[in-house]
Amino acid sequence: MTTYKEINGTDIEVVASDPSNPLVGEVWYNTTTQKLKGYRQVIGNAWSTGGNMGTKRFNGGGAGTQTAALAFGGFTEPASTVNTEKYDGSTWTEVNNMNTARREFASNGTQTSALGYGGQTPPGDRVAVTESWNGTSWTEVADLNLARRQLAGAGVSNTSALAFGGETPAAGQVGNTEVWNGSSWTEVNNLNSNRNNLAGLGTATSALGVGGDPGTSANTQNWNGTSWFEVNDLNTGRNGASAAGTTAAGLVFGGTSTVKTALTETWNGSQWSETNDMNTARNQMGGAGTQTAALGFGGEPPPTGTTTEEWNAGITVGAWVTGGSLNTARNYIAGTGTQTAALAFG
């Protein structure tokens, strides 16, 4: 039977107090507590509080990563805003404003290359306006073919985007889908079902449209660059949710089910799984990041908030569970066996 020394090259260390910074897999005997201990890896997923935004808002745009995000536009009560802020992982800083104040628009991109399109301007007009962010300022570019609000978007920069779904006064909920190539929008195949208030994630050639209205839908559709096809539904239907990630590794959080929710679900390319909730239930917040490192900011609890939450999924380090003490304290011992049938000698 293989011993600890044969695996690690050393005997089990005997100490009076636990190491302050043990290595993963390290084992030691604490003579003070008379406990044999070790260190292991624990998989953990959790939301934590980030820095507050300077301007409270909901129905705004979001782009970027957890440590380099952009928040822009939205509704600040009692009016829409042009305010733009960037996030460095701890603090929000105001930068140059958008040209057109609006809410309920779609967005995508990074902190230095973002796009905002569609939405609603006072006193309730649906717009097709598209603005491009270059890391310093906003510039108006070519309009959407269909003016609408409450649409979703996907894309990695201000030169590549997908706009889908939404609502117009004439048609109500729509399934219209348009692709942005950096200079113009082109109409392509529609969603399989007309929806508004849905969440979007992914790229212009590989995207997900998730949830939305009518009702509080759980429907999920996948865009393959040519057409939409239905995939497995969310576990909890909702509208007004936020999203991050890709079609292979996605994240949806918040929104409204029967009430505003903190529920978070992960997507593995084929199905949704529930995971740990946000700290604050809310909808219509900005979102950014990836499945393992996401950001949710602003939103409507109510009242409208400035709160930022950071999602981290990965490996954290924690202590092993302590077992029973040896009958005789000793050092330089050998051991063999299994966790439930072990032998210590020498």
Task: Give the positions of each predicted feature.
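Polar, enzyme-active/binding microenvironments
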Residues: 1-346
